[in-house]
């Protein structure tokens, strides 16, 4: 029987650097995760590509996927839908492949209910002023939207206790090392490896 893969869920407030950390994790030669690309109805930012950063879809297409039960999770955030297609995630986990989700906090809580065995990591900013500077630095939102995102971020940070781990994103390379350590630790938990030793003992009988 193939050992089921780990589901690693990374989320945190808007502007905390989830995408940057996720990219750094996947560039690290010591990691071997598969990445589940999220679907969204928001417009692409400069440099983003459909099917690489997100699946950019219309609101109608997204809502049909919800009705058809094809979304593992979804949330509406600042007027746009974000979500994770279910089929790809299930296929990879069943094949024993670790899969990495980078999603919004609302969506992470839905995944927590659907797949409580997942590993949930909350990425935090060093402080709120730094978070605000990062959002402003994107240059893609009006100050009204920035303030809206900050209010949402405060509420999301209060939900940190619902996660298994918290990682501060002050230096990206340090955040990546911490995430790698978390995944390595999870793979060593006895409930994941004990079946191997049971088979070994059976072979000695």
From Swiss-Prot:
Subcellular locations according to the entry: Cytoplasm
Domain of life per record: Bacteria
Annotated transmembrane regions: none
Keyword Cytoplasm: yes
Gene3D superfamilies: Guanylate Kinase phosphate binding domain (3.30.63.10), P-loop containing nucleotide triphosphate hydrolases (3.40.50.300)
EC assignment: 2.7.4.8
Pfam family, one: Guanylate_kin
Main localization category: cytoplasm
UniProt GO MF annotations: ATP binding; guanylate kinase activity
SMART domains: GuKc
Key words of the record: ATP-binding, Cytoplasm, Kinase, Nucleotide-binding, Transferase
UniProt-listed InterPro entries: GK/Ca_channel_bsu, Guanylate_kin-like_dom, Guanylate_kinase, Guanylate_kinase_CS, P-loop_NTPase
Residues that coordinate or bind ATP: 12-19
Catalytic activity: GMP + ATP = GDP + ADP
GO CC terms: cytosol
Residue span(s) of domain Guanylate kinase-like: 5-184
UniProt KW Metal-binding keyword: no
Biological function: Essential for recycling GMP and indirectly, cGMP.
Family: Belongs to the guanylate kinase family.
Name this protein carries in UniProt: Guanylate kinase
Lineage start: Bacteria, Bacillati, Bacillota, Bacilli, Bacillales
Gene expressing this chain: gmk
